[in-house]
């Protein structure tokens, strides 16, 4: 059948056919949206279970910035609370730092619709940061420290037992490489930690969630997003480099980023070089074979028939 005949048939197709196609497309969209919601609930639930993030009787203070990730976190936690076998409370908290053009009406209006407890903390940290940081320099580090101290105080005042942040899997990966490349440390962003003041437990329930999923979920739910650049701070170029690197890896080498993320939970201290984590100095041969022990001279992990051709030969002396 020629293309012209197909085109004519399509043009003359009854309205019912177009309506049927539109209905099927709508069904597919609904299906995909539901699948995304189920995946987010499953991943957040798994993270909560794996790291014992939420316990019976907890009061979770969800830090809501107005960005896609914190909105998604609050939404999914509210869903899981209805299904959970334990009882826990949620209170949403936003810190209004008095940044220029901050739409202070958006979050209260949104939270009132949800009918959950919330608190808006008004603190002019913006003026402090602008006074102390030279023009053109990034203000994120100082702003973060000020914000952290305020949120710890608010958690105490509200009686919160856990502080929930909206960092996702991509944030964790980026932080890991930032610390490695620019800080010379093997250090990431843990899913659960004790705060630096020793008084609070901070949790990151989105630890297993990809940023692409929170972006799509925010579009589906039509969250009232508040821009994150109202302070006028310069973008963190180092983090941007890492983000671009990971995206390029994911594009060129599918599965690589997944493997790196999995490696964060399968660390072997005896095969690194930190004497604080493993007692190299006191290591002695016991004379007892270890069934799961490693051999001293490991074979090259990629020396298979399929990769022999990619091995670079050593230069021979003339």
From Swiss-Prot:
Record bears the keyword Heme: no
Superkingdom, natural source: Bacteria
GO cellular component: cytoplasm
Metabolic or biological pathway, per its Swiss-Prot or TrEMBL entry: tRNA modification
Residues holding [4Fe-4S] cluster: 140, 143, 231
Protein EC: 2.8.1.-
Cofactors named for this entry: Mg(2+); [4Fe-4S] cluster
Official protein name in the record: tRNA-cytidine(32) 2-sulfurtransferase
Native source organism of the sequence: Herminiimonas arsenicoxydans
Name of the gene encoding the protein in the UniProt record: ttcA
